[in-house]
Amino acid sequence: LFFLINLGYFKNYPTKKKRKMKYLFVLLFAGISAGAQIQKEQLNLMPWPQNVVINEGNFTLTKNFKVNITGNPNPRIFGGVTRFLRRLDGRTGIFFEQGFIAKLNEVPNAELQINCTKSGKIGLYEDESYHLDITSNKITLNASSDLGALHGLETLLQMLQNSSTSFYFPASKISDFPRFTWRGLMIDASRHFQPVDVIKRNIDALAAMKMNVFHWHLVDDQGWRIEMKKYTKFIELASDGLYYTQEEIKNIVKYADERGILIVPEIDVPGHGSAILTAYPEIGSKVITLTGGTSEKNIQGTAIATYGIERNAGIFSPTLDPSNPKTYQILSGVFDEVCPLFPGAYFHIGGDENEGKDWDANPKIQEFKKKHNLKTNHELQTYFTMQLAPMLKKHGKQLMGWEEILTKDLSKEAIVHSWRGPNEGMAAGQSLVDAVKKGYKTVLSNGYYIDLMYPIASHYLNDPMPKGANLTAEEKARILGGEATMWTELVTSTTIDTRLWPRTAAIAERLWSAEDVVDVENMRKRLESVSFRLEELGLTHIRNKDVILRNIANNQDIKALEEFSNVSEPLKGYTRNKGGTEYQMYSPFTLFADACGPDAKDALGFNVAVNQYLANKSADNKAKVAAYFTKWIAVHQELTKLSANAPLVQPLLPLSKKLNDASQELLLVLENKSTLKASDLKGLIEQCNTKDHADVELSVYESLKKLI
């Protein structure tokens, strides 16, 4: 119509009437656009549900939107729905008339109807499925338990869309359930203590990503973090005053329960014992030979060694004495006090990285091994582990430990936590296969060590179900799921969120969604939206980057630092803290490497631009590549200026200079104007592969190589 009017087909119509026809056409087109159906691929759902069907129409939100709950849910559903409403009004700015939901069937004609048939029990094997049906005038959420309903509410929040003037949910049907029953995150609160608010906001994030286990690593060489009423030396001598009171722990457990999260505490024994033995050295294995004088004796007559809280990272000798009855007396008392704080069915006893050096050097322990026909330290550790099992069982707890606990004599009730891989000289996931074949339930963490700064794709494509392992259906059923692990040797409360999120959301999808949901680029697209939305839960993973950069810039303009961080990544694996001694637990973690993360944004974009240019050397594609080089040249200039009044910028200049030099020459290469020999050009690019500056590396190196 618009086309015909302009061609003169309606030339005999009055001008005013023709204007009206054009106006009606614009309105008609706008209406068609506003009503255009969203495509499934445009949704930013994570984890991706098992089944999604998009239908015609939308449910438009107004202030009259209300929620009603029916069935027999756990009371946690009321808090969950209230939080849902607050997050929804926070996103939309709509002043909903409904404030707090406190009882069943309060608003029978509400637009959102939630029905739960039973009260969900926190733990494994609960039905977490849900069914969400959105029409143009009603939303129905059905779930067997309130845990499933909470998951459904998270999906509903992610379904929220907007036009220029309103917010709506696309009409759809979603049926969903988790693939694995154990979908966890471990946070190490020993090496760097993590305050209560850090723990709570990350529990909120776990719930948002439909994860259901929080593994709380509370005791290691670097500190004891649980208030003890009986054995008070733990907090007096081994905590640096940084610990959770029992009331704080109870409060966090309640907080997690309200969000459907199981908490699994960990006290790491018999190795990683520096903090424990700082408090109670009499149960240590180390032998001290006295040259004179007298010394207090432990009950076996061995001089008591002096231990201290460990300030470095790594594997250390202090180990509990498995031959000493007092070891079990103290641990039994600890479990009697700690187990009631955690109502869940599982207790993690660590059991990893015990090299047995102090055991080998202690004659009494060697005598104990012979007496009990224990041929190896591994068998001795199994003996130790099996003494703990009844202590935990008394409190209704199942024992769980890192994969080193696995021996032929281990009780089949124990859960084996698989963690070692190529970094430890092992085949990835081999212990998981060994465990399930021997009849043990197991959880995978190898491949989910997010503290090691590996690319997100490496975690996302790491499936707990091993390929080609030839497992029976029964053996596969013993693979409970997986757990992301956040060790905190190089992580403080300021940086922990930036290391956890949004990458943990990709792991959450691997543990929840169907096995064939493996499109990395699609995941990245959705993750960008998910990351933004996680901020509403109080996570600091986006804003704290700028906090660190402002400190580095000495409160000057941080734009150049931001741009440089977009091509820089922290050194990966264990290379940032070689030998565990470059940093101590009290070192500053406010450096440039702490502001950087894996999957540097501009590195990803530059790689795409280079690939497009190499496939089609058009002027447009060449300009896109050149724009990056121009930017990096300017960044080096700005960093140089910035460093005049910002000493913390100085360590970056050698690296930014190398990128600057490569960029200048590659601009000439793009124009066929470079006069450098091929070997010299290659050497210039190789300079960008250095790992010698500021504990970061340039993540554009591989893409730069493609251009020569």
Where are these regions (language model features)?
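A structural preference for short, hydrophobic beta-strand core positions in alpha/beta folds
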Residues: 98-100, 265, 401
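Beta-rich nucleic-acid/ligand-interaction surfaces
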Residues: 102-108, 222-231, 406-412
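Bacterial Sec-dependent N-terminal signal peptides
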Residues: 1-41
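Flexible loop/turn segments at secondary-structure boundaries
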Residues: 75-77, 193-195, 221-225, 270-276, ...
